[in-house]
Amino acid sequence: MAESLERTLAGESMHLLAERALFWPSRKRLFIADLHLGKADIFRRFGIALPSGGTRHDLSRIASMVERTGATSVWVLGDFLHGAIDSAQWRVGWEAFRGAHSALEVGVLAGNHDRALVRAGLDLLLLGDAVEDGPFSLRHMPDPRAPGHVLCGHVHPTVKIEGFPGRWPAFWLQASTCVLPAFSAFTGGRTPETMQGDRLVACLHGQVLAL
């Protein structure tokens, strides 16, 4: 196992990172999906105990990846938010992150939890719900009609691995689609219904494992 795994997608060298992100070196761009900022706050508000983590931990992971890869942009493939923006505790952490990384471009595709972003004032590049970026079609959900190789999220693919209890987030590589694992730790997941030729790459204990 290693911290990252290089794969060629649509003729481009792409790095699958153990932090559940995809790095495009030629564009210095990180892709993540299903960040769900604010979800941990909602759980705690309703008295649901959670392990350590949440917004601060997720933003720290992004900052670490930016420093390690030299990325100049981070694009979120939908579900940047989870819940309302007003008075959200996570917003303080987000504003501190943007202050420390003011030169970093943060782009967001619209996901099913992102309706409030238009008026949010979060220093984001709002990309709409579909972007053609070089050979890639960026979407929140898989789209078999897209003209390019699809990069997306929404599915939250997970796998079981013998010898490692629990379920682990995974990249799901198909012939013309790469589904990213959910970046947030506070999401459910499911085992993909794979077809012949599909590949899964699991993220576990800071390493990636091709299955």
Where are these regions (language model features)?
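Extended recognition/assembly regions associated with phosphoester-bond processing machinery
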Residues: 1-77, 81-211
